[in-house]
Amino acid sequence: MKGLSGSRSHHHGVTCDSACDSLSHHSDRKPYLLSPVEHHPADHPYYTQRNSFQAECVGPFSDPLASSTFPRRHYTSQQELKDECALVPRTLATKANRIPANLLDQFERQLPLSRDGYHTLQYKRTAVEHRSDSPGRIRHLVHSVQKLFTKSHSLEGPSKGSVNGGKASPDEAQAARYGKRSKSKERRAEPKARPSTSPGWWSSDDNLDGDMCIYHAPSGVMTMGRCPDRSASQYFLEAYNTISEQAVKASRSNNDVKCSTCANLPVSLDTPLLKKSAWSSTLTVSRAREVYQKASVNMDQAMVKSESCQQERSCQYLQVPQDEWTGYTPRGKDDEIPCRRMRSGSYIKAMGDEDSGDSDTSPKPSPKVAARRESYLKATQPSLTELTTLKISNEHSPKLQIRSHSYLRAVSEVSINRSLDSLDPAGLLTSPKFRSRNESYMRAMSTISQVSEMEVNGQFESVCESVFSELESQAVEALDLPMPGCFRMRSHSYVRAIEKGCSQDDECVSLRSSSPPRTTTTVRTIQSSTVSSCITTYKKTPPPVPPRTTTKPFISITAQSSTESAQDAYMDGQGQRGDIISQSGLSNSTESLDSMKALTAAIEAANAQIHGPASQHMGNNTATVTTTTTIATVTTEDRKKDHFKKNRCLSIGIQVDDAEEPDKTGENKAPSKFQSVGVQVEEEKCFRRFTRSNSVTTAVQADLDFHDNLENSLESIEDNSCPGPMARQFSRDASTSTVSIQGSGNHYHACAADDDFDTDFDPSILPPPDPWIDSITEDPLEAVQRSVCHRDGHWFLKLLQAERDRMEGWCQQMEREERENNLPEDILGKIRTAVGSAQLLMAQKFYQFRELCEENLNPNAHPRPTSQDLAGFWDMLQLSIENISMKFDELHQLKANNWKQMDPLDKKERRAPPPVPKKPAKGPAPLIRERSLESSQRQEARKRLMAAKRAASVRQNSATESAESIEIYIPEAQTRL
């Protein structure tokens, strides 16, 4: 409050210059009064309409009580405003309204000035006399106050010369002051009619000198807060409006000051309010914030409309630098800067920074929403201004306003944020002010569903179409992919990794090209599960393209970095099918949408789709996706077509046309060429969730339900003639399958099994340790539902059954060996020990674990074990299983040695770790050769046993150990571009 204290001294100095030597005499007090005849408000056009103001003047003069209460009404908080203001109506009711306006001048001139109110203040006169003897010091304080206010954000616009230099007369300065605070005039109302008893204004300053009370109470009129007593109001206003030195000099002659001030005072409800507004307009920011917040409640724009319109059109209503107002120029009318805009400089600065695009998406007051609308439309696309369907105005729900902003911003900024390398951000977006807001798209997409779809779809379609129409030319050119690295999909390393693990199928016209054809990529956006037809509704005429076969499926591929969960659906199909599917909204995934690559794919998809259905991008050897190899291709046959029709499938795969034979696909005889990475085929009734650990991959499902012509091509999934992994992949009726794409160390699995795991368990997922254990055969239809899903009781029961079958096989074999061979007693003892231990383990611990699994599956079980409990118990069970496995391992080694007892050296070697077996220090050469032979046999047996022992742990570490799934390991270095 240094500025306030300085202003106080300034204020008093102004009054003291003309009357400091006559302060002690009552008769000399008249200079402090406005000249009633010359400058009474009744003489001014602003006051002619307000008889209440003139009448109000009477109250203080003729009411000694009101005058004498002036010192006692030195309130200490703004809360007393209402009490103070209550005095004005009472005084007016008693005397003021009974006195005509034309008698007021004479009345004021004849009144004895209510000396009793002044006598109560005489004790403070000495402080004023001490201060009034140095006008130069007061001028210095005036300038220091001006400098302080110049530094604050709420004063001193650059165009105001009347503040800094004597460019304006006191009249102009006063008008400018009131013009700047015209909003506070509007904010004022009758309860604010604070008597000019400046104590109320100074109540927050405890160290206020009482001398200012002298200058505001020299006449009783000031006690009642009347404006005609210009001596007080003028000094008050001049001092705290930091008037120029010329204004200070002019204020030394009270009459001049009175005239200049009164002539320009825009009168609102009450003049005390006016003085208070002028005072509060010059407070520092913190003080002004209090005043505004209290005064803004009482805005009465209708009462002051005429004055504010007549006056300050040339004034800037708030002394802030004009360039900081983003498009808000003073208009002089009721649509001036809203009061909430004047609260603090930081608020103004925040308003100035709005165009940066950094503003949050939380709802703001309507002016701020308007500003955001303007700046956003500038920053996004020129085409957005052409939208009439999306004038995001107050008619729309505020939720839709904000979210459509963030959605459009997120969709538009994708093109410059980690987008294609060949895309020019400056060419795509006119404004570079976008920020990377990964969560904007997520928020917008996930909450759009809360708004009615009828409200959203129309707007978003038009908005997206206009946004993407600006981007289509550049983006589609970039998608031609003649240059490596343009396409963000990790297809090259992705398929390269697949290529190593899959075999070539000559019968099925497998096409493995060493140098993959770079083809135009056609993409269609993957939609969030909460939004239908958000980006993919484009009805532009597609370019003419060669015909396609009717046997090509609607395809989407998936590949994922271990650090980013891009969600890209690359689809290919017939034109009509593409249009239908684009509206289907069935391409859902639980992958997070916060990756900018997902948005990049969405933009690319939309741009590609603008030109037409994705299926028609076939010219120039266009394939659906840029790929490097064909994993396996399946011919389109009619086998099992009836069964396939019964099972609606969702498929994931890559379909690629041969670059050398682009037109060959037009012939129905030529089989379609597929690059099958994996097939995610789900029954319609199977509601599986895609579970992942570490946003490694995404599986995108494409709907095939409406198209019968897809059945032929996808039926070949069941073609058993395909060798290698794909033959195994498609060796069953494909109503369900799993796809696993694994980044480095991160595992993703798409569970596709039904909730009832009643089918037989195939121990083939547990590689049998020994060739004599026959794997249990299963029906292909039952294998359809087998998948490695979350580890519940069903899953552990299957593991337990596999271990039981394996141990029973060992026991049966050893018992058979015991019967068939005449074995020594020690070896028989070992066989009985191993078999007994295995049977005991199966009878006790296996039984106990089975009960735990059943309790886990029973929702009514009171101490219901969790899956974690089962996993822990299973780990402990593995220790016992391993011990028994070692016993049978020893028996296998004895059998390999023709049931001959091994010497202690061999036992040592056998018990040593397999990598570093200890060899005997001595021994004949033939024995060493024999032991080496036995060691190799033992190691083979040990390998088989270790494979069995690792079965569960391998399955736990990799959720896709199933024989019916494909694991694709993509190093993270290859997936991150």
UniProtKB/Swiss-Prot annotation:
Tissue distribution of the protein: Expressed in brain.
Region described as Disordered: 150-203, 349-371, 899-965
Entry superkingdom: Eukaryota
Compositional bias (Basic and acidic residues): 903-912, 928-943
Signal sequence region: none
A molecular function GO annotation: molecular adaptor activity
Main location: membrane
Entry GO terms, CC: glutamatergic synapse; plasma membrane; postsynaptic density; postsynaptic specialization
Record PTM Phosphoserine, positions in chain: 169, 356, 359, 362, 366, 383, 412, 415, 419, 422, 431, 503, 510, 562, 565, 589, 592, 595, 932
Phosphothreonine PTM positions: T563, T590
Interaction with DYL2: annotated segments: 650-661, 672-683
UniProt keyword Phosphoprotein present: yes
Keyword Mitochondrion: no
Motif PDZ-binding in this chain: 975-977
Keywords: Cell membrane, Membrane, Phosphoprotein, Synapse, Ubl conjugation
Subcellular location: Cell membrane; Postsynaptic density; Synapse
UniProt-listed PANTHER family: DISKS LARGE-ASSOCIATED PROTEIN 1, DISKS LARGE-ASSOCIATED PROTEIN DAP SAP90/PSD-95-ASSOCIATED PROTEIN
Family: Belongs to the SAPAP family.
Its biological purpose: Part of the postsynaptic scaffold in neuronal cells.
Name the record gives this protein: Disks large-associated protein 1
Taxonomic lineage: Eukaryota, Metazoa, Chordata, Craniata, Vertebrata
